Amino acid sequence: MPGSLKEETALLLEDYFQHRAGGAALPPSATAAELRRAAAELERRERPFFRSCAPLARAEPREAAALLRKVAAQLETDGGLNWGRLLALVVFAGTLAAALAESACEEGPSRLAAALTAYLAEEQGEWMEEHGGWDGFCRFFGRHGSQPADQNSTLSNAIMAAAGFGIAGLAFLLVVR
């Protein structure tokens, strides 16, 4: 396991972005598997919105990291960070990274990963540590003993309750861009 929040965040985002770009590798950790699972659920529930974000990366590939930073700042002003908003931000970044990979912009996904790692581990590191780091993420979205059907329903409800304002903030920022 990585020694710091920044290292763990970088590894998780690198894995998730590779996964979103079509990499078939198994997740390297239980945390990576939980991130993939929770992200897939949010993306499935908000598919039209996230699909509408992909062209933004293709239109201005060198500006994708700056756009990600703007969205992160907007989420912060719309009520602060929570696990649902963090997940929405990761899925948004993963959408941009996958679009950049499809466009053969080789450095784009790594720039996004670096920008999001810096935001989560440095700018929001205190919040993440106070909320248990990535273990806290897994506890929030995790499966702790519930039945699979209940689990998916609980996960969906938790994501949408926590990320609701985050999705609205993303949509607003993209409209006024």
From Swiss-Prot:
Positions of short motif BH1: 75-94
Expression by tissue: Mainly expressed in neural and muscular tissues.
SMART domains: BCL
Annotated transmembrane regions: 86-106, 156-176
BP-aspect Gene Ontology terms: extrinsic apoptotic signaling pathway in absence of ligand; intrinsic apoptotic signaling pathway in response to DNA damage; regulation of apoptotic process; release of cytochrome c from mitochondria
Quaternary organization: Interacts with BAX.
UniProt motif BH2: location: 126-141
Subcellular compartments: Cell membrane
InterPro entries noted in UniProt: Bcl-2-like_sf, Bcl-2_BH1-3, Bcl-2_fam, Bcl2-like, Bcl2_BH1_motif_CS, Bcl2_BH2_motif_CS
Keywords: Apoptosis, Cell membrane, Membrane, Transmembrane, Transmembrane helix
Any single GO CC term annotated in Swiss-Prot or TrEMBL for this entry: plasma membrane
Full protein name: Anti-apoptotic protein NR13
Gene that encodes it: NR13
Task of the protein: Shows anti-apoptotic properties. Counteract the pro-apoptotic activity of BAX.
Induction (UniProt): By Rous sarcoma virus.
Membrane-related topology note: Multi-pass membrane protein
PANTHER family: BCL-2 RELATED, BCL-2-LIKE PROTEIN 10
Family: Belongs to the Bcl-2 family.
Molecular function as annotated in GO: BH domain binding
